[in-house]
Amino acid sequence: MSDPKYAYPYPAPGNYPQGPPPPVGVPPQYYPPPPPPPPPPPPPRKVGFLEGLLAALCCCCLVDECCCDPTIICFD
């Protein structure tokens, strides 16, 4: 009996109280509930007037520098 696998004796035979049965109509809980759905993605950001204006000005300045400079030949 000094062997570690026999550290606890077997329980005595007999009836053991198991508690009341579960209520009728309630399914047993075998699996954990599913995780909540992820939050929706944020709405797309709208470009404001000032940002669009600055982009247009930069584009115009770039085109002016590249295409209106007589030292740069774009077409033959």
Curated annotation (Swiss-Prot):
Record's note on what induces expression: Induced by heat.
Cellular component, GO, one term: plasma membrane
Record keywords, A-Z: Cell membrane, Cytoplasm, Membrane, Transmembrane, Transmembrane helix
TM region(s), chain numbering: 47-63
InterPro entries: CYSTM_dom, WIH1-like
Main location, first listed in the record: membrane
PANTHER family listed in its UniProt record: PROTEIN CYSTEINE-RICH TRANSMEMBRANE MODULE 11 (PTHR31568:SF105), RCG49325, ISOFORM CRA_A (PTHR31568)
Name the record gives this protein: Protein CYSTEINE-RICH TRANSMEMBRANE MODULE 11
Organism listed in the record: Arabidopsis thaliana
